[in-house]
From Swiss-Prot:
UniProt keywords, alphabetically: Ribonucleoprotein, Ribosomal protein, RNA-binding, rRNA-binding
GO molecular function annotation: rRNA binding; structural constituent of ribosome
Protein name: Small ribosomal subunit protein uS17
HAMAP family: Ribosomal_uS17_B
SUPFAM superfamilies: Nucleic acid-binding proteins
Superkingdom classification of source: Bacteria
Subunit-structure text: Part of the 30S ribosomal subunit.
Organism: Leptospira interrogans serogroup Icterohaemorrhagiae serovar Lai (strain 56601)
Assigned GO CC terms: cytosolic small ribosomal subunit
């Protein structure tokens, strides 16, 4: 799968790497996207950090995961763990 956003059943899927798992049932992932700048036509990398709900605390730092958009779970959490694509080495 390609990095960034994808759709499944009208929900957005985000693919990113786990950068923090110090919270209980929550991981922070870094999602990187590439866009072409409208004026300068240069490819620019953008990144965003998302807080993702991990019910079983199964993610570790370095894992590549898919997160799906969901209802608000807390003040900053709006995504759930959908699938672990690749475990950290």
């Amino acid at each position: 799968m390609t990095a960034g956003k994808q759709h499944i059943n009208k929900s957005l899927l985000y693919e990113g790497r786990v950068v923090s798992n110090s919270m209980n049932k929550t991981v922070v992932i870094l999602v990187e996207t590439r866009k072409t700048h409208p004026k300068f036509k240069k490819i620019v990398r953008r990144s965003v950090r998302l807080k993702v709900h991990d019910e079983k605390n199964e993610c570790v730092v370095g894992d590549k995961i898919l997160a799906i958009e969901t209802r608000p779970l807390s003040k900053e959490k709006r995504h759930r763990l959908y699938k672990i694509v690749e475990k950290a080495k």
